[in-house]
């Protein structure tokens, strides 16, 4: 089989060219921009770092707790501003009871008593308690019955 020298030269030139174009690099998502804006705002308020805080707990109305294991706290008392930075974990109150008890004061004894009663009754604890009687109007379904037939 004879080889045509013109076609061979053309193929060698084509092989030297780059095929596919330039690779586009993926952009990295940086959360540092938000942190720098926050730090700039706190710098304008002359916030100082509070070193004595090891952990922080924020109680939500639904009975959950935002728990910061390692927390950074900055405070600007003259502007009534505190900033908590870190990675929160959403936990149930019952998971944190042994750690929370020494931190709670006398004003929270009523909440603790209600929580203990709910745990003893076998219910899941909820801080609100406003939806306790809402399930009384809902009928129980029995196997084989349709929803419309139950009164």
From Swiss-Prot:
It is found in: Cytoplasm; Nucleus. GO terms for biological process: protein transport. Disulfide bonds: none annotated. Its main location: cytoplasm. GO terms for cellular component: cytoplasm; nucleus. Keywords: Cytoplasm, Nucleus, Protein transport, Repressor, Transcription, Transcription regulation, Transport. SMART domains: NAC. InterPro entries: BTF3, NAC_A/B_dom_sf, Nas_poly-pep-assoc_cplx_dom. Residues 32-97 form the NAC-A/B domain. Residues 122-151 are annotated as: Disordered. Part of the nascent polypeptide-associated complex (NAC), consisting of EGD2 and EGD1. NAC associates with ribosomes via EGD1. PANTHER family: TRANSCRIPTION FACTOR BTF3 FAMILY MEMBER. Belongs to the NAC-beta family. This is Nascent polypeptide-associated complex subunit beta. It comes from Meyerozyma guilliermondii (strain ATCC 6260 / CBS 566 / DSM 6381 / JCM 1539 / NBRC 10279 / NRRL Y-324). The gene is EGD1.
